[in-house]
Amino acid sequence: MGQYYRPVVETTKGGMVSINTYLDGEYERAKLMEQSWYTHPFVNAVVSRLYNKPSKIAWVGDYATSVVDDFPNTPVQELYNTAYGEGSISLDTLKSNDFTLDNKFLVNHDTKEFIDLNKYREENTVGGYCTHPVSLLTALGNGCGSGDFMYHAESEEQVANVGKWAWNTLEITDTAPREYKEVMYLFREN
């Protein structure tokens, strides 16, 4: 059966809120690989919230509770409850915008690392398609349902990196932070 994902972001008061999988009032497909394309309007609308505004973020699958032990420093159960539990709070429908990752950097303030997104796109484009680093690096539950990245990856190393930045403080910036280490992740489909 397919696993569906919802992004969960940190509120300004340190709480958590889920983002509905709707864009401009229309339902957006919610399997991980459906939300893992570089130019996907829904994903970029979510990610635009990180532009010059650091925030914790995770892409939470509806089977994520089966991976709690794989993420000992991540509040997987609380993130799951925020996304899918009774009384979960969700943001209103997102509006599309023209935000892109061109000439930007994805910064992880917890690990003191960053990704040059122009280089990322160059390294990860295969057949004209490129995966989106944010949904894959923050995914919780990969491998628990069809439509997950593990069924599409070129290598086990790529699969192991899915979720590596889940619930870390991320930011999209126009400049690379000087004291941080530049890293590269490959998420290419076979």
Residue map of PLM features:
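Charged, low-complexity surface segments at secondary-structure and domain boundaries
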Residues: 24-33
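Low-complexity intrinsically disordered segments
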Residues: 32-190
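Short, extreme N-terminal segment that most often corresponds to the first beta-strand
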Residues: 1-25
